[in-house]
Amino acid sequence: MFLWTDDQKNAFLRLKEALTTTPVLGMPTTTDVFYLDNDGSDVGFGSVLSQRQGDREVVIAYASRVLSKAERNYDVTKRELLAFVVGLKTLRHYLLAQHFVVRTDHSALQWIRRMPEPMGPLARWLTLLEQFDFEIQFHSGVKKCKLRWVVEETALRRG
């Protein structure tokens, strides 16, 4: 059973505030590499853009949205790729003409650009990816707490 009282609501609001203000949310630099983390779930997905500045990782921006009814039928790989594509579209003003690193815990994304004959949405998405200079790094169990918060918060706000 899930219990949501004023204590839980207040804790959630404090967490939300902490994740969206400095020192967590920072300004981008022109000298540091960008990192893009994405996560998809059954209800939505989110992206977090960050940079390693000095001895800490600084979040630059968040992006998220709820899945449409049709998108909820996508398999996990397609949802993860959709999260990546929407993150790129939303955060493109940071990422165009920059080399950046995409960190994922979904190993299938590593080979997505080598797909032999993509069709439909996959073909359109791969065309979009060609505009960007990035490398994909697979990390088993990438920390997703910030991403999970972005996804769940978006789902809560939009019902």
Where are these regions (language model features)?
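Acidic, metal-ion-coordinating active-site neighborhood of RNase H-like domains
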Residues: M1-G159
